[in-house]
Amino acid sequence: MLNQKLNPTPSEDLTIDVDLLYETDPCELKLDEMIEAEPEPEMIEGLPASDALTPADRYLELFEHVQSTKLFPDSKTFPDCAPKMDPLDILIRYRKVRRHRDFDLRRFVENHFWLPETLSSEYVSNPENSLKEHIDQLWPILTREPQDHIPWSSLLALPQSYIVPGGRFSETYYWDSYFTMLGLAESGREDLLKCMADNFAWMIENYGHIPNGNRTYYLSRSQPPVFALMVELFEEDGVRGARRYLDHLKMEYAFWMDGAESLALNQAYRHVVRMPDGSLLNRYWDDRDTPRDESWLEDVETAKHSGRPPNEVYRDLRAGAASGWDYSSRWLRDAGRLASIRTTQFIPIDLNAFLYKLESAIANISALKGERDTEALFRQKASDRRAAVNHYLWDDENGCYRDYDWRREEMALFSAASIVPLYVGMANHEQADRLANVVRSRLLTPGGIMATEYETGEQWDKPNGWAPLQWMAIQGFKRYGDDMLGDEIAHNWLKTVNHFYQEHHKLIEKYHISGGTPREGGGGEYPLQDGFGWTNGVVRRLIGLYGEP
């Protein structure tokens, strides 16, 4: 196993020789051997074919025309538009008139589509409200009621009410929702918790997994599998009994482990990788290898600069979106270049910790129901995963978890994702103590903990801090008895959010926390979003634990 330095400089381990031809990369040559291991996916299950179509599938060259000309500043706008008539009629009309000299694309789109509303655009916060009051008053603003499905819209109707993050995000998101739920529970909104619990269970029943979000263009991927954590929250807060979700947890597990039994050593299929010693670990994946509908132009431009087959780049970009860390140096071979993305080649520490939690939850609930064989099976699966993680993803020299590049058979970067094993109880006490020292020296700032120590311009890197990472770090270290570090992160984060709130009277998606006064976080493919679901949820929960900052 080849170990990189824990804190490499950009001129050393974090960069690659971009002059090397793609064809000469010995790792990438293995792709030829994996064609049968990673076949083209079948049609997406769970919806009638007509409703599973994404806007790119429906509108073909019209979609590409709109996106390639940047008709809207945000690439997500057009995929979220709803057609005013049958999409086939729209496409036929477009083909008839597009070559006319006086053809106006903007007018055509406005005549044939309803544009999405800007969420919460009319909401003005009361500057006299405390941070707690502000969050509690935002829940109704961010709540969307169930509605009839608009024919041919990309929005997937849900049976119950749900919370959206805010800003450009007008749909519910899988892993965001867990951290939002923490705050809903603290605010006493058990009604919304029940609705969201039913929605996620419904999606598993109908789609076989929880999609990235409730849009057709999100059906081909999921997000970090946190449903087991949601079920635990439902049980703790008396919202729903955990036993009713055992079948749903098993279905989600089957989605993530699909194809595992057929894999030979060093082979992968969808989300599963069989390691050289026969153990099974997981990676992020998307069943499509085309530009994302919601970031179509950005993906096309990224692929142009990669030197790789575009479909491979698109797959890795999509898998990066499935990770929730879109994007980060974690997925890049060259830290300053998004075109070097290789998400599917990495075994992520956080994903495998979440799946350990899923396996453990299935075992625990099976025990409650007296299903002893299932309990024993999943206890063994969790034990096997922990052993594999310790073998491949634990850096004993530096005392931290790191992602693993399974193609190159070497450890990858250190990041705040390393705290997830503590959050789910997968680490031992020695690992937790050693990791605490690394987090203190590498990621901790007066504003919280940063996503990584590498400044790349990507939003899930230095200098940004994100609410879910703070929560998992706080609770993870406290779980292993390090109350001092957990409390320090909590107070630092509350101070960051409150300082920004006192000046701007809003909560935002991410914060710049590396030195100086906390301010808006930057980087990424879209402007900073306010609202913001998971920031509200984590901060509201922390206020319940620590009081108003």
Curated annotation (Swiss-Prot):
Pfam family, one: Trehalase
SUPFAM superfamilies xrefs: Six-hairpin glycosidases
InterPro entries reported in the protein's UniProt record: 6-hairpin_glycosidase_sf, 6hp_glycosidase-like_sf, Cyt_trehalase, Glyco_hydro_37, Glyco_hydro_37_CS
Assigned keywords, A-Z: Cytoplasm, Glycosidase, Hydrolase
Coiled coil: none
Keyword Hydrolase: yes
A GO cellular component entry from the record: cytoplasm
Localization of this protein: Cytoplasm
Gene3D superfamilies reported in the protein's UniProt record: 1.50.10.10
Annotated active site: 326 (proton donor/acceptor), 509 (proton donor/acceptor)
A molecular function GO annotation: alpha,alpha-trehalase activity
Protein's pathway: Glycan degradation; trehalose degradation; D-glucose from alpha,alpha-trehalose: step 1/1
Swiss-Prot/TrEMBL catalytic activity: alpha,alpha-trehalose + H2O = alpha-D-glucose + beta-D-glucose
Principal location: cytoplasm
Signal peptide start-end: none
Binding-site residues for substrate, renumbered to this chain: 168, 175-176, 212, 221-223, 292-294, 324, 525
GO biological process, alphabetically ordered: cellular hyperosmotic response; trehalose catabolic process
Family: Belongs to the glycosyl hydrolase 37 family.
UniProt cross-references to HAMAP family, sorted A to Z: Cyt_trehalase (MF_01059)
Annotated protein name in UniProt: Cytoplasmic trehalase
Encoding gene, per UniProt annotation: treF
